[in-house]
């Protein structure tokens, strides 16, 4: 490919709405263009990277016996209603009606479609296990699309689904996917973590995420340096002990707290620490209101709440709903005298004489005690684990980091097969629901994650495995006939040998070419310039300042050998150490 023909419009200036390095460099490097918030066009360079990522993923899927299919993006609501997720999935689901007023969704995932497909085709345990996958566009109506490709409304994903006659068979496939995903990460050349994760709206009873550490990552990871425990903050358990307070219970008293609503304000006004205040949070779900109680100095983990109550539709009640249904402004809600289901974090159990909302504007109760003053229906671990909390395995203080989730695997069990009546006949002639797993990989976000991992102040540093082109040949003076002739010859020789090579034959300055080469991130650059008078060309790795001079007076043998050596030694990790 010639640069003068390549559609790669680079930008000198950074677009104003850029929030991350990957977003900036992919826009400036001519890889993507924004159509609308969270929606992008992939230009030729971006498409080449995507295809290479897809091929790596496809090769690893085929290696473990998964079979590729392609399912429709447009999905009928009936299937989602069968599984119970039409209402549970939440506002991220893009819903629409056709001209006949029938409900559809632009698929955010395909469990319903694939379960419906298989239940009509597979009848016997002899046909199991079966794993199907696709690489296709997905849609989620993100409330705030951001970070470029990392949180988009339209994105490319590999989703796979496995069907089994036994849990043992699912376990085997699950481990195969763990190994396959690890190989994908290794082929990308990035550092990664495998962490325990929450199942969320997908469901199931076990889940792991494959995460690339990154400062701008939206996955919060807790890990233990001693025993190796790793989990997302949505999943991390708190198994530390809570103090059982021994003080005498004091008489309950309602006190005026004018305009005092937040934990900090209540703490200062009443002269009590936040740990002696209990937050009362009202949520709405399928079964109506539920009040959640947690110590004032802790944060509620919504993912744990939804998992424990088995209701992904749970959301915090709005101030308007609370005022209408309870007659109390937000900030003064409390558990005393309220007839709703109450669930509490274990941190509340050992408290004595604590503060709660007074269920009346500008009031709070002091010296509240459980179970004297109110009843808790269910107790759970609902707190968000943070850095410094004890490891649930060995008790050592946990460390925290951030990461970008690329892969997510789930043991679904019979969640979908039972709901959608997908059965097979086992060896005893009995009808049983399929035991399922599902396995996602974010293809388009992989591109952004790799850039976040491998870059410098000048641009992207692509690993060889997914670089749009491996080599760029820069003719530094297009008015020099010898440089043009030699540059063209090197380009021809490399092309004939199957190298993915670009010839920069534009009538621009050498500095302009160097800046574009660094911004785009070509792994290896060959300079054909002034040193050609001595029969020498220069080779340079993208992340290195060293120029390797190669004599070509007697042909291109030494050049080809040096290029192969550079490719063998090429390691973008050297740029981020």
UniProtKB/Swiss-Prot annotation:
GO MF annotation terms: aminoacyl-tRNA deacylase activity; ATP binding; proline-tRNA ligase activity
EC code(s) of this entry: 6.1.1.15
The entry's keywords: Aminoacyl-tRNA synthetase, ATP-binding, Cytoplasm, Ligase, Nucleotide-binding, Protein biosynthesis
PROSITE patterns reported for this sequence: AA_TRNA_LIGASE_II
Domain of life according to the entry: Bacteria
Record's catalysed reaction(s): tRNA(Pro) + L-proline + ATP = L-prolyl-tRNA(Pro) + AMP + diphosphate
Segments forming a coiled coil: none
Keyword Aminoacyl-tRNA synthetase annotated: yes
InterPro entries membership: aa-tRNA-synt_IIb, aa-tRNA-synth_II, aa-tRNA-synth_II/BPL/LPL, Anticodon-bd, Anticodon-bd_dom_sf, Pro-tRNA-ligase_IIa, Pro-tRNA-synth_IIa_bac-type, Pro-tRNA-Synthase_IIa_type1
Cellular component aspect of the GO annotation: cytosol
Localization (cell): Cytoplasm
Self-association and partners: Homodimer.
Notes on the domains: Consists of three domains: the N-terminal catalytic domain, the editing domain and the C-terminal anticodon-binding domain.
Protein name: Proline--tRNA ligase
Gene coding for it: proS
């Amino acid at each position: 490919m010639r640069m003068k023909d390549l559609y790669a419009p680079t930008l000198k200036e950074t677009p104003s709405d850029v929030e991350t390095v990957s977003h900036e460099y992919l826009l400036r490097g001519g890889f993507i263009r924004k159509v609308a918030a969270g929606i992008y066009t992939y230009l030729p360079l971006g498409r080449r990277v995507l295809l290479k990522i897809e091929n790596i993923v496809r090769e690893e899927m085929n290696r473990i016996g998964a079979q590729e299919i392609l399912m429709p993006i447009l999905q009928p609501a009936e299937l989602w209603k069968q599984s119970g997720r039409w209402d549970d999935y939440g506002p991220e689901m893009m819903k629409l009606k056709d001209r006949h007023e029938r409900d559809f969704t632009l698929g955010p995932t395909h469990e319903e479609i694939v379960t419906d497909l298989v239940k009509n085709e597979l009848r016997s345990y002899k046909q199991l296990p079966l794993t199907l996958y696709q690489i296709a566009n997905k849609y989620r109506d993100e409330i705030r699309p951001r970070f470029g490709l990392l949180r988009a409304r339209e994105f490319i994903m590999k989703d796979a689904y496995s069907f089994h006659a036994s849990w043992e068979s699912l376990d085997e496939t699950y481990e195969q996917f763990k190994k396959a995903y690890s190989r994908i990460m290794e082929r990308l050349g990035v550092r990664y973590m495998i962490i325990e994760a929450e199942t969320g709206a997908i469901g199931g009873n076990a889940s792991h995420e494959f995460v690339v550490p990154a400062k701008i990552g939206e996955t919060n990871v807790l890990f233990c340096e001693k025993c190796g425990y790793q989990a997302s903050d949505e999943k991390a358990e708190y198994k530390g002990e809570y103090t059982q307070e021994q003080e005498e219970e004091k008489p309950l008293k309602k006190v005026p707290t004018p305009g005092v609503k937040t934990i900090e304000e209540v703490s200062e006004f009443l002269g009590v620490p936040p740990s002696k205040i209990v937050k009362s949070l009202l949520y709405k779900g399928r079964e109506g209101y539920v009040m959640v109680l947690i110590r004032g100095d802790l944060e509620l983990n919504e993912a744990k709440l939804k998992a424990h109550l088995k209701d992904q539709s749970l959301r915090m009640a709005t101030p308007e709903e609370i005022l209408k249904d309870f007659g109390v402004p937000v900030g003064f809600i409390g558990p005393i005298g309220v007839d709703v289901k109450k669930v509490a974090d274990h941190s509340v159990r050992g408290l004595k004489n604590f503060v709660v909302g007074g269920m009346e504007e500008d009031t709070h109760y002091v010296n509240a005690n459980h179970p004297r003053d109110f009843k808790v229906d269910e107790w759970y671990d609902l707190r968000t684990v943070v850095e410094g909390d004890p490891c649930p395995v060995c008790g050592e203080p946990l460390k925290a980091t951030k990461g970008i989730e690329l892969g997510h695997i789930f043991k679904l069990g019979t969640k979908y097969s039972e709901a959608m009546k997908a059965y097979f006949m086992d060896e005893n002639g009995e009808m049983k629901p399929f035991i399922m797993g599902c396995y996602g990989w974010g293809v388009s976000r992989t591109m952004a994650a790799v850039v976040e991992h491998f870059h410098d102040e000048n641009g992207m540093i692509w690993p060889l495995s997914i670089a749009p082109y491996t080599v760029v040949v820069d003719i530094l003076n297009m008015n020099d006939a010898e440089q043009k002739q030699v540059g063209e010859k090197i380009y021809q020789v490399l092309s004939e040998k199957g190298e993915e090579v670009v010839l920069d034959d534009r009538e621009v300055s050498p500095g302009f070419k160097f800046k574009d080469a660094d911004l785009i991130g070509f792994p290896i650059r060959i300079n054909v310039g002034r040193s050609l008078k001595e029969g020498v060309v220069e080779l340079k790795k993208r992340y290195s300042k060293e120029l390797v001079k190669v004599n070509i007076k007697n042909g291109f043998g030494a050049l080809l050998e040096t290029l192969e050596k550079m490719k063998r030694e090429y390691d973008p990790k050297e740029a981020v150490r």
